[in-house]
């Protein structure tokens, strides 16, 4: 007899996501469904607006990936108008991307995903002196792991526990059987969790140097950047470099070491050795380091075969809505995408409750529509995007920087290449992508310094002919994977706009053929230890770093409400 488990909401992510799974009598997941429960609708808001404003609207898609959508909106319009920004502008944008990656991935591992690996209550039982000595096993120069520091961290969290309230650590499945770290290892990660709060603040300041503020920077404009004086001010350049070195140091001495430690301990934990059932990977070049070299490579790897990189045919990219809450079901290219809503709601069913008993709740209509996310496909096939795709495509393309960091990690952990195609591997790949920026971000900085000596231009002039029609797109790899924005311009205003975001590729539903997207496929076949504590589900989904940004209602250009959708509170099976 099968049972259904609903995890709603999936917390420690950006946005609103629920996961439903069907398990058999052995607690093995037989089917899975990914549902985004609120609507964004930003594409509709952009229609009829000046294309030069696109980036300022698109960065409001979410409060985490602000710069990614900002740059995408600006760059899509530049592509449509045939504008090439000066090299200085491109390099400043690279420094902003590097700042974002260092911030985003550090926050994800420690503050969003880390508690799926680290048992906080176990850390309270650790011997700080033993933990301090153990840290040297994973780093020749560990950070925030002195015996006195670890004792202070332990005492700080113990004070929360003594009051019967673990504060930010209160809502989790502590003591779960799939936690594998020793108390001392948990204490090391806990110390780095707290240290990362300081590090992410510095990384945000790096972005603000070039973008005026973070989140929602303001310095990009169609044609270039406006942070001209910052690029010419030695003190601002030095400030960015100092902060960059500080954050990069943490990545190499803490983040890298902690993932190496996780690889050693969790390589025998079955629940993290699967989680990658769509082995098609899509990456696109991003972060120019100079006139000719990019940090990331472009291409598609199919069926996990890293001996071949397929060139991208953009005409094969489509989105369909057979199982999404939109009226138009057929597969459309993003230039022609539609987003007229068609919300059909949930149905009643019994599911496994928090105490393991069956409870009545609302579940999706799995044969109908069940999410606000469309199903992107490439030639009819699902693709995974994100750091794992960056590393896999980079290895297949023989990208020297990616080869170096990935090869060193596999050597340090003793893991085979096949281990990358797992939940553990996906988590490691995000760290490796962060390490790429930590190890090679200075190349873009040095290129900017060198180019400013001979050329100080930061902007390319242009005109928009209102009698012409334009179309263009941005495509590039951002922290959560390949992001693309597609724009049509007519009569000097935006006629149509589509954003195909990384979590669209990964979190999308099955298509008309019943083929699952990466989230859904990643859960099938995994065994749960305890149906009332589905930590394994949380860990797999968090490894993708979900970003389900959305809006509840949409306004037309005159401020009139077009539609409003209320998502009723759902009695859920499990919360985390």
Curated annotation (Swiss-Prot):
Highest rank taxon of the organism: Bacteria
GO CC terms in record: plasma membrane
Pfam families listed in its UniProt record: NiFeSe_Hases
Intracellular or extracellular location(s): Cell membrane
GO molecular function: ferredoxin hydrogenase activity; hydrogen:quinone oxidoreductase activity; nickel cation binding
Presence of the UniProt keyword Cell membrane in the record: yes
Reaction(s) the record says it catalyses: H2 + a menaquinone = a menaquinol
Top-level EC class as recorded in UniProt: oxidoreductase
Family indicated by similarity: Belongs to the [NiFe]/[NiFeSe] hydrogenase large subunit family.
Name of this protein: Quinone-reactive Ni/Fe-hydrogenase large chain
Organism: Wolinella succinogenes (strain ATCC 29543 / DSM 1740 / CCUG 13145 / JCM 31913 / LMG 7466 / NCTC 11488 / FDC 602W)
């Amino acid at each position: 007899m099968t049972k259904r488990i609903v995890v709603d909401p999936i917390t420690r992510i950006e946005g609103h996501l629920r996961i439903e799974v069907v398990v058999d009598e052995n607690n093995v997941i037989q089917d899975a469904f990914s549902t985004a429960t609120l609507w964004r609708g930003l594409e509709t808001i952009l229609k009829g607006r000046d294309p030069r404003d696109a980036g300022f609207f698109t960065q409001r898609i979410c409060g985490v990936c602000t710069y990614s959508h900002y740059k995408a909106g600006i760059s899509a319009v530049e592509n449509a108008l045939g504008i090439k920004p000066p090299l200085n502008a491109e390099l400043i944008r690279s420094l902003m991307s590097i700042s974002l990656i260092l911030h985003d991935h550090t926050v994800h591992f420690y503050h969003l995903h880390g508690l799926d690996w680290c048992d906080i209550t176990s850390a309270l039982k650790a011997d700080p002196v033993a933990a301090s000595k153990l840290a040297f096993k994973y780093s020749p120069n560990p950070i925030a792991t002195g015996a006195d520091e670890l004792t202070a961290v332990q005492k700080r969290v113990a004070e929360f526990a003594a009051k019967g309230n673990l504060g930010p650590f209160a809502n989790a499945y502590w003591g779960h059987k799939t936690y594998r770290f020793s108390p001392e290892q948990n204490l090391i990660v806990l110390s780095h969790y707290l240290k990362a709060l300081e590090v992410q603040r510095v990384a945000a300041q790096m972005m603000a140097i070039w973008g005026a503020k973070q989140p929602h920077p303001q310095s990009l404009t169609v044609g270039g950047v406006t942070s001209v004086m910052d690029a010419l001010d030695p003190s601002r350049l030095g400030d960015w470099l100092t902060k960059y070195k500080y954050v990069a140091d943490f990545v190499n001495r803490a983040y890298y070491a902690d993932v190496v430690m996780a690889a050693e301990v969790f390589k025998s934990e079955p629940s993290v050795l699967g989680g990658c059932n769509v082995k098609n990977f899509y990456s696109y070049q991003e972060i120019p380091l100079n006139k000719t070299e990019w940090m990331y490579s472009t291409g598609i790897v199919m069926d996990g075969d890293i001996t071949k990189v397929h060139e991208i045919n953009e005409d094969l990219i489509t989105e369909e809505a057979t199982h999404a809450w939109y009226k138009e079901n057929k597969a459309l290219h993003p230039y022609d995408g539609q987003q007229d809503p068609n919300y059909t709601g949930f149905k009643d069913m019994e599911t496994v409750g928090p105490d393991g008993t069956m409870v009545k709740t609302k579940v999706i209509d799995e044969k109908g529509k069940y999410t606000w996310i469309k199903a992107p496909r490439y030639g009819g096939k699902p693709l995974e995007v994100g750091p794992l795709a960056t590393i896999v495509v980079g290895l297949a393309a023989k990208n020297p920087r990616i080869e170096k960091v990935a090869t060193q990690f596999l050597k340090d952990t003793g893991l085979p290449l096949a281990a990358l195609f797992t939940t553990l591997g996906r988590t490691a790949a995000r760290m490796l992508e962060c390490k790429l920026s930590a190890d090679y971000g200075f190349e873009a900085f040095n290129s900017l310094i060198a180019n400013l000596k001979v050329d100080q231009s930061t902007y390319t002039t242009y005109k928009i002919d209102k009698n012409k029609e334009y179309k263009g797109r941005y495509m590039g790899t951002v922290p959560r994977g390949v992001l693309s924005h597609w724009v049509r311009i007519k009569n000097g205003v935006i006629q149509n706009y589509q954003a195909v975001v990384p979590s669209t590729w990964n979190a999308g539903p099955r298509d008309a053929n019943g083929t699952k997207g990466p989230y859904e496929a990643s859960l099938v076949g995994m065994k749960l230890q305890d149906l009332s504590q589905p930590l394994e589900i949380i860990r797999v989904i968090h490894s993708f770093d979900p970003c389900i940004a959305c809006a509840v209602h949409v306004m037309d250009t005159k401020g009139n409400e077009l539609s409003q959708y209320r998502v009723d509170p759902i009695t859920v099976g499990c919360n985390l």
